[in-house]
Amino acid sequence: MAKKFRVFTSFAIEDANLRTMLVGQGRNKNTPFEFVDMSVKEPWDSAWKTNCRTKIKGCDGLIGIITNNTVKASGQIWELQCAYDEGIPVLLIYGNDDRPANLPDPVKGRRINLWTWDNISAFLDKL
C-alpha cells in the first residue's frame, strides 16, 4: 500500500468546490496518488494564524489551488507564504483553464502546474 502523505490544501474560499474535487481525486481508487487532506475547513478564532502555522508545519507538503480568486484571498496568500517560510514543499496548480492575470507576491515568479494526476503524483513522490 502506498504511503499516505499529510497535505495541506490551500485555496480561496470561493474555490472550496475545487478543494473538494482534489480531495475526492485523492480518494479515488483509480488515481495514482493518495493523501490526507489537512486544509482549514472552518474559520478559526483570532489565533487562526498560530493554529494554521502549526497545522502546515505538521504536513509533508502543501498543494495551492490557484485561480482568479487567489489574488484577493488573504487567508490563502498567508497560508502559501507560511509554507514557504517554514520550508514546506509546495505544489501550485491551476484550478481551471482561466489563468489569473494578477498573482499575489507568494506566487509571483513561481511555477504553476496544470492540475493533472501526473503532476500531483510527481510532487507526492518527492515528499
Question: Which positions does each model-derived feature cover?
Answer:
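Switch/connector loops and helix/strand junctions flanking conserved nucleotide-binding motifs
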Residues: 18, 73, 99-103
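Structural motif corresponding to alpha-helix initiation and N-cap regions
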Residues: 46-49, 77, 117
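C-terminal helix of von Willebrand factor
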Residues: 113-127
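Inter-motif core of Ras-like GTPase G domains
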Residues: 62-64
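Conserved TIR/SEFIR loop-to-helix hotspot centered on a Trp-containing motif
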Residues: 68-86
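Glycine-rich, charge-decorated loop segments at or immediately adjacent to ligand/cofactor-binding or catalytic sites
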Residues: 98-112
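Conserved N-terminal substructure of TIR/SEFIR domains
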Residues: 1-58, 88, 96, 127
